Amino acid sequence: MGLSLLGLMACGQKTDNSGGNSSEGSGTTARESAKETAKAEGENNSDVTLSVSIWDTNQEPGLEEIMADFTKETGIKTKITVVRWADYWTAMEAAAQGGSLPDVFWMHSNESERYMSNGMLLDLTDYIKNSEVIKKENYPTDIWSLYGYEGKDYAVPKDIDTIALWYNKKMFDEAGLAYPTADWTWDDLTEAARKLKKPDGSQYGFCLKPNNDQAGYYNMILDRGGYILNDDKTKSGYDDPKSIEAMQILETWIKEDLIPSAETMSENSEDVLFQSGKVAMITQGSWMIAAHKKNDFSLANADCVELPKDKVTGRRVSIYNGLGWAAAANTKHKEEAWKLIEYMGSEKAQRKQAELGITMSAYKGTSQEWAKSAPFNLQAYLNMMEDMEILPFSRSTVTWEDANTELVTKVYTGELTMEEACKKMAAQMNEKLAEEHAK
């Protein structure tokens, strides 16, 4: 491998809620390995324990239950380690440098191309081709595209996510306001936030962190008809007039103090502020349901609804993404790792993932059960699937995302206007994209 993963991952990571011999293979193809597995069918796997890494503690209990089913069926044990998102990729970098990546782990579109292009992930192409369980047509095509590189597949889709608006019913009742509906526009949200804000700063109408692109302003940009990244990943759309118009809605919230300061939000996540009664509304991804359904405050006060529409276009878009189950290229347990990945992507496991309320599943037709898993209007998330666009990504996603967050933060602090920030974001993104295509 010409470049170490360390060098490729030296830039900072998005911290909220986004080595050498690891690429060396055994010289055995997946097809040959599958044949060897068939020969060894029936052998005792009880001595194998697969290391599994994820970043969400809320999903851990449900995944442990599903993996316990896997162990009963195969004899292969698993051990889940949770590393929070803020530290996950740093930990993976260190593991990659030491040649000790977990056997199986979550992969994200922000990092997938770098891992795939540097040979860090086990090639699953032939495993998938020969599987009776994993059929590509049963999952969204765009999710497969996140984890494919040069005609090869390196992960099996784990889930799919959409975005919805959460609101505090008690705060709306106290303000004498009707609850948000699917007919709302972003202007309706702004007007409600003005009425929900308290002058003493004890309560804000809305909350959106500077780095909350996926669950926040990406959706607004697409609603208005702007774009973040063009189809061939060569140009940023932040300087498009429609993108700027959409981002100026956020600027209004900032200028009118309808949302907490950047400093306050740097110390507290949006869900913490919402669940502590400090903000009346937030936008959140479907991956957060596990946290809400075990939170007494949310259970007593919260519900969700579809995102607002754009008043000009009438469009209501949800950015969507999906994680992938991947394996280390140098795992000592390739066959067992594949068996776990295959099981976790199966209709059976995907349906149980939805039924347990872990998250929406990638396997088509299984997420309806997820909507019944908690006493909230989770149908809103399924309805958001009517108009979805995949989360923008390129080989250097993390570098331009983090750089853009720094500029958006300067709008929060009054150092830049939103138009200035958008034009600067476009310029620096275009530089990063040009570097990608020059390699």
Predicted stretch roles:
Residues 46-57, 76-81, 103-104, 154, ...:
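Short, well-ordered beta-strand elements
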Residues 192-195, 233-263, 307:
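Glycine-centered hinge/linker elements that transmit conformational signals in sensory
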Residues 69-139, 174-176, 273, 277-281, ...:
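Extracytoplasmic "Venus flytrap"/periplasmic binding protein-like
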Residues 37-44, 109-164, 219, 301-305, ...:
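Hinge/lid segment of periplasmic solute-binding proteins
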Residues 305-306, 355-406, 410, 434-439:
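Long, aromatic- and glycine/proline-rich binding clefts that accommodate carbohydrate-like moieties
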